[in-house]
Amino acid sequence: MFQLPILNFSPQQVAGVCETLEESGDVERLGRFLWSLPVAPAACEALNKNESVLRARAIVAFHGGNYRELYHILENHKFTKESHAKLQALWLEAHYQEAEKLRGRPLGPVDKYRVRKKFPLPRTIWDGEQKTHCFKERTRHLLREWYLQDPYPNPSKKRELAQATGLTPTQVGNWFKNRRQRDRAAAAKNRLQQQVLSQGSGRALRAEGDGTPEVLGVATSPAASLSSKAATSAISITSSDSECDI
């Protein structure tokens, strides 16, 4: 395997390469680059203090499923606020995945809330402000725009959107998945209510044709009662657009 002459690189140059590979989303290449770094004590000491290198190591550890290493990096190094959002996402997602593996099923909102309470963000990647777990309006606007163009973005588009919103590709993918599920549920509910309205209208027409008067306040069947309620109220079907993860 070809290796770059890392020994001639300064810590700043190494950090620059890490940042470039991180932005490209090529985690595999980033991992190979990190493995090729020197092991000399002097060089390691300098690199271990560089935030870009530490952030790159955390990303590689997460994608490799090495969550113990990820937690060690995040808990033992103080990161600047610019890195907080991405590293917080890695911390939470890693704990979610461990909990899912342990329970043998996907986590629901309540499960995720309990995981967050059990494993709070370390102060090394958190400034103490309470996180709402809701996407900002600008982020939601961008996600909705992209969703209307393509509800099934490929990995490249997910990375592009992640960079534009400050989220991780995993968060972007989860948002699109949840939005598709909400839209399908709303469409199914809409079809059901339209069927109820249609059945209610048909019965009313038949009753009028037969000359049978309707008795106010008396429903001949549960279905008739349901259709009556549906016919006398305006129906508005909208898919939930909440991005809260509670």
UniProtKB/Swiss-Prot annotation:
Modified residues (Phosphothreonine): T212
Low complexity composition bias: residue spans: 219-246
MF term (GO), any: DNA-binding transcription factor activity, RNA polymerase II-specific
Localization (cell): Nucleus
Tissue-by-tissue expression: Expressed in the developing and adult retina. Also expressed in the hypothalamic and the pituitary regions.
Alphabetized InterPro entries for the sequence: HD, Homeodomain-like_sf, SIX1_SD
Region (Disordered): 190-246
Record-linked Pfam families: Homeodomain, SIX1_SD
Modified residues (Phosphoserine): S221, S225, S227, S228
Gene Ontology biological process: animal organ morphogenesis; eye development; regulation of transcription by RNA polymerase II; visual perception
DNA-binding annotation, residue ranges on this chain: 128-187
Superkingdom of the source species: Eukaryota
Matches recorded under CDD domains: homeodomain (cd00086)
Main location: nucleus
Polar residues composition-biased segments: 191-201
Assigned keywords, A-Z: Cataract, Developmental protein, Disease variant, DNA-binding, Homeobox, Microphthalmia, Nucleus, Phosphoprotein
SUPFAM superfamilies, A to Z: Homeodomain-like (SSF46689)
Family, similarity comment: Belongs to the SIX/Sine oculis homeobox family.
Complexes and interactors: Interacts with TLE4 and TLE5.
Record's function text: May be involved in eye development.
Protein name as catalogued: Homeobox protein SIX6
Native source species: Homo sapiens
